[in-house]
Amino acid sequence: MNSGPACATADILVAPPPELRRSEPSSLLIRLLPVVMSVATVGVMVTVFLPGSPATRHPTFLAFPMMMLVSLVVTAVTGRGRRHVSGIHNDRVDYLGYLSVLRTSVTQTAAAQHVSLNWTHPDPATLWTLIGGPRMWERRPGAADFCRIRVGVGSAPLATRLVVGQLPPAQRADPVTRAALRCFLAAHATIADAPIAIPLRVGGPIAIDGDPTKVRGLLRAMICQLAVWHSPEELLIAGVVSDRNRAHWDWLKWLPHNQHPNACDALGPAPMVYSTLAEMQNALAATVLAHVVAIVDTAERGNGAITGVITIEVGARRDGAPPVVRCAGEVTALACPDQLEPQDALVCARRLAAHRVGHSGRTFIRGSGWAELVGIGDVAAFDPSTLWRNVNQHDRLRVPIGVTPDGTAVQLDIKEAAEQGMGPHGLCVGATGSGKSELLRTIALGMMARNSPEVLNLLLVDFKGGATFLDLAGAPHVAAVITNLAEEAPLVARMQDALAGEMSRRQQLLRMAGHLVSVTAYQRARQTGAQLPCLPILFIVVDEFSELLSQHPEFVDVFLAIGRVGRSLGMHLLLASQRLDEGRLRGLETHLSYRMCLKTWSASESRNVLGTQDAYQLPNTPGAGLLQTGTGELIRFQTAFVSGPLRRASPSAVHPVAPPSVRPFTTHAAAPVTAGPVGGTAEVPTPTVLHAVLDRLVGHGPAAHQVWLPPLDEPPMLGALLRDAEPAQAELAVPIGIVDRPFEQSRVPLTIDLSGAAGNVAVVGAPQTGKSTALRTLIMALAATHDAGRVQFYCLDFGGGALAQVDELPHVGAVAGRAQPQLASRMLAELESAVRFREAFFRDHGIDSVARYRQLRAKSAAESFADIFLVIDGWASLRQEFAALEESIVALAAQGLSFGVHVALSAARWAEIRPSLRDQIGSRIELRLADPADSELDRRQAQRVPVDRPGRGLSRDGMHMVIALPDLDGVALRRRSGDPVAPPIPLLPARVDYDSVVARAGDELGAHILLGLEERRGQPVAVDFGRHPHLLVLGDNECGKTAALRTLCREIVRTHTAARAQLLIVDFRHTLLDVIESEHMSGYVSSPAALGAKLSSLVDLLQARMPAPDVSQAQLRARSWWSGPDIYVVVDDYDLVAVSSGNPLMVLLEYLPHARDLGLHLVVARRSGGAARALFEPVLASLRDLGCRALLMSGRPDEGALFGSSRPMPLPPGRGILVTGAGDEQLVQVAWSPPP
């Protein structure tokens, strides 16, 4: 409610009257003075009566001592009493003066209380003057004055209670001052002729006894108060009257409170005047109302309380007696009850009849709708173009926002003061429920209805993400509707950039137009015929700006910049909030030239906005507000309502219109409404004024310049991105996403150019941020813009298997997962081979760069090869599981770009990529990082990349971007590509038959011992025992070690006669039984004892072959000083032969260094488990020191490097790595020779 004139309520402490003074004892000096004077008098008398003194001669001299004696006695007797009486008198004078001053203060308080009470409860005869004003319907449920009604005037306690301090005891009290205090309290503890109010509460019936005429006069006064102070949405007034008394209450029919909320008759809402209480109860049974007041003027009396109804009865008849109020057993006599004549009550009711309550609780006068205020009239026939053409310069940017209490339209003009406006910037503050959102919608809709999009654009911002502006997004005037900034902090920085970019854009347009000083001059230049683009005023409305500045204080700098230059740039601000904290504006208040304030939470908030507390005193009615212009003038207004239903006449063609008829308007219910003809169409919902006007605006005027483009919430589709992209300027430049540039108010394709130094790519982001998708998008984009003869891909998928989805592309040669280590290794080998081949090709053909080669390739297809991309998804996993490949990849990244070989990888952190590789990566795509502080692009911007938005990240220049989704069809690309396909990676078969390998090898290998097929070229591979006499085979169980020995044995037999080769097979597990059945068998040993005997004979043979001193150099060169077969000692399961008790093969140790000259060959197979330790055993250590060849078959990698840098790895049976020298390794599949 409106608080009205202030009235003090604090208690007044009245000082108690003084006590009577006690007689005070004299001081010692005063008590001794009479004694001294007496002695002095006696001395004088003695002197006088001495013989020869003058007194003896003249008796007149005796008068002097006698006078001294008398004066002394009188002074001693009377001096003390005189002082006591004088003190009491002074106390009385002081206290009576105090009461006189206090009387003046109390009188002023009483006068202020009179004013306040009469403002709160005015004379009922004056109520009609308040109708239509700000105080009408001000009392709301829950307020202290709700249903508190004046019933008359009389004595009332003083608002400031007079509290007397502790009184002195009765025997010590001063009777004069005590009597004065008693009279003061009796005169001022109450005030006379004060309005007396009683609360009306649901409970037992209230009865008013007395003279019926006076009782009805009091009831009329009470009902008019209820109707003026309370809204019909919150309180209804019913009447239960007999037919004899109905004429006294006929005026009730005019009250909007007396109209039934649901029931209707032929005249509209049914009046709530009934004949009996039961009839009223039945009529109100279906209504859900907080309060109903029923006037009962019948012979019937209520037997108790009626649920939800306050009943006031005309009680017992007492002719000539004043009314007496009876309620709940209490009786209140009224000395001077209020009276309201019937004609005065009728005037009050009929004035209230013109008022209703809108859907938001806002009061309005019939006929004062928004359309009428704006000048539209019938919204259905509204032609925006016509209205815009008729708007003159004065009405430009000027819009009605509501009406004053007397119905005058209130205009908001956001033009600057130089153009007789209120702007350019303003403030709007209103508490929750005050109608602030409706006011903002009203302003926005009015601005659009009265101004063309060429004149005005709107940027609507709602920090909290409410629905204030959502319906306005489709209007041609709206540059953007920005919501939900509170939950999306990065969008606040984006809006800051967008507003700064708009200021920069407008400044640039003014410069290009001839360094114009303002938008006003720019528009005048356009009107005079200058060919300039449209530059409308931008009206920026920011709701909940206080919350925005609270969470993002730096945003005030943007508002300050607009406040300083917005006038010249045509950017107008309207800042709205529920509350305005002192100091929050930080200098912005100097730029706010007009202010609108609705109901505020406190008086201090109202003072912060307007400089007065008037906004706090506004009624709780939504939409009630004050407008303060730059001159300080305050204009009270009620906001127009645009969210209500559109009022429009029914089409005359639907049903014939009945002729008008005259019906009596009484308190009796008219005939019920009869249903019209049943049509064949369903009821069409009534649109709101807002939506109806927005529908009429569609298609009129140019669309507003998009200051705010939609955020990167949804990733684009790659297909659409490629269709819209401009032709690439470089050979390998493709768009893979969208970059958001809010300052430039644009979104541009994220184009990655891989044709030069930026040919290597790294995609870095936290888990589930879209790294794999980004690599797929890159592959798809290149595949869609290049055929398989120009770009090819080989993928290592160590992520979640996403790259397997591109395997169907013709551009993809192979996709290897973590379960395919051989394919991964083979892929690297092929790419390394490609680099070496291209290096030689460039050198032979005088090509100085890969760019030059691409130019030549475009002219001639001869000797063309594609750009090859090694795509690695999951760099950390590759380093962990296939560490041997890392160095090859780093070398490939360093050397490959010069020959058209690229590396693209994904990682979770930049730290996972070693500097040696990171330095080779020129194209860096950074998605959301787990720790934004790890960003290598922009740490501050990295913090703003949203979480749980796969594909969102930063471009190389620190701008926000989103990767496109790869929506292309690989099968369709394969059909479109035609014949060119990426060559697959040749892989070794799981099994190679020995006979087929022998047939394939033919006679090319000569006497070399055939082992199987090598991976690189798929050709047979052999072991040259002539150059390297020994071979070590290592592997786990079931890996094919014995099969490899079986193949070697049979191959030795096949390629050598028995005279040239003999085999000594050491087979403690009997796995090589019957492998050799020819004369090549020197011996088969299956036990340590037998082995010792055989080796003894062998040692004798070897000792005999040692060159004698007389052997010539020619004999040594031709190895002709001895004759006989080479001896092949084939040892299976060497770990069973070399045991802790001894190693029989130790006898051969001294001959191993001379084995090639002596015709000795040692072929040893051993488990790889514990091989790292076993290689220090003397025989094996000697073999390794002599550089023997090794075949590393399947084993555990944790054994470490066994030969050079080679370490075991899981391999299929029969497959192994043949180590033929330092760093020379090749993967082979051992030819399968079945056991006998």
UniProtKB/Swiss-Prot annotation:
The keyword Nucleotide-binding applies. Keywords: ATP-binding, Cell membrane, Membrane, Nucleotide-binding, Repeat, Transmembrane, Transmembrane helix. GO terms for molecular function: ATP binding; ATP hydrolysis activity; DNA binding. ATP binds at residues 430-437, 765-772, 1035-1042. It is found in: Cell membrane. GO terms for cellular component: plasma membrane. The chain crosses the membrane at residues 32-52, 59-79. PROSITE patterns: FTSK. SUPFAM superfamilies: P-loop containing nucleoside triphosphate hydrolases. InterPro entries: AAA+_ATPase, EccCa-like_Actinobacteria, EccCb-like_Actinobacteria, FtsK/SpoIIIE/SftA, FtsK_dom, P-loop_NTPase. The keyword Nucleotide-binding applies. It holds the Pfam family FtsK_SpoIIIE. Residues 407-607, 747-936, 1018-1201 form the FtsK domain. It is a multi-pass membrane protein. PANTHER family: SPORULATION PROTEIN RELATED, TYPE VII SECRETION SYSTEM PROTEIN ESSC. Part of the ESX-4 / type VII secretion system (T7SS), which is composed of cytosolic and membrane components. This is ESX-4 secretion system protein EccC4. The gene is eccC4.
